[in-house]
Regions:
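Intrinsically disordered, low-complexity terminal tails/loops enriched in metal-binding residues
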Residues: 1-264
């Protein structure tokens, strides 16, 4: 691997269980698909001590993103932490397979956002998914969601999603995780995590908006990317999915700049 490849790898997050002296511990979870149980883990520091001090980011101290390695079975959840640093939540794998689990956090000790990841296996009869086609539109729970924008490796891309229902724009999007929508972007294949941030000011409690929500992001390499949009209407969270292709040359990371991190 040459120096440019090394720098690029360092700038892409969500590929390691350890970053900046913090380690995502072994994840315990139900061993079989469709089995009820608990998913639990700790995050430890360089001395092996579980960390208990985290800053809230996008309204939560930890964002847990879970997706099967073929890009299906996406979930974005928020476990609770006990006094000893053990994060947990009730859990059931809905399908057998290999899953990537991402913990998105801001340790108080550094004040820097990091993304740690591990792979977890759920045993059972595996049903492979057909690769999703390129798509900038999705329909979920009766809502039509369209995405406008092009991913690029050479500049920040503006991605605007628009939500409608029965042909009418939805103007009652509620605040969710500090914005009117939350977008996760993963590089197909290794499932590297992109930094994505919403545009505009944080909404006031009780405010509503719509039908458009805009995000900014930049792809590290050309290729296909899997995008997952969470939005909330009438206290219900819905998830739309898209597949985009990024164009342009691979980035050469500047070692003098801070590495990018995942959005939440």
């Amino acid at each position: 691997m040459d120096s440019n490849d090394t720098q690029l790898a360092a700038s892409v997050k969500g590929l390691s269980m350890e970053q900046d002296g913090f380690l995502l511990g072994e994840i315990s979870s139900p061993g079989l698909a469709d089995q009820e149980g608990t998913l639990a883990f700790t995050i430890s520091n360089a001395t092996g001590t579980p960390v208990t001090d985290f800053e809230a980011s996008h309204d939560k101290k930890l964002h847990l993103i879970i997706v099967r390695t073929d890009g299906t079975q996406f979930r974005h959840v928020h476990p609770t932490m006990d006094a000893h640093g053990l994060w947990s939540l009730p859990w059931k794998w809905n399908a057998a397979g290999s899953y990537r689990v991402y913990a998105d956090i801001v340790p108080t000790a550094t004040g820097q956002n990091i993304t740690l990841t591990r792979t977890v296996q759920a045993a059972g009869e595996f049903t492979p998914a057909t690769p999703a086609p390129l798509s900038a539109a999705d329909t979920v729970d009766g809502y039509d969601v369209d995405l406008v924008g092009t991913l690029s490796t050479s500049e920040q891309a503006m991605l605007t999603v628009s939500v409608s229902r029965d042909g009418e724009p939805v103007t009652t999007l509620q605040p969710y995780l500090g914005s009117y929508g939350h977008l996760v972007a993963l590089r197909e294949g290794d499932l590297a995590y992109l930094h994505v941030h919403p545009e505009g000011e944080a909404p006031r409690p009780g405010a509503v908006s719509g039908p458009d929500v805009t995000f900014m992001t930049e792809a590290p390499t050309p290729g296909r990317y899997l995008l997952y949009l969470d939005f909330q209407v009438d206290e219900q969270v819905h998830t739309a999915q898209f597949v985009l292709t990024a164009t342009g040359p691979a980035q050469s990371a500047d070692p003098g700049e801070p590495a990018e991190h995942s959005g939440h």
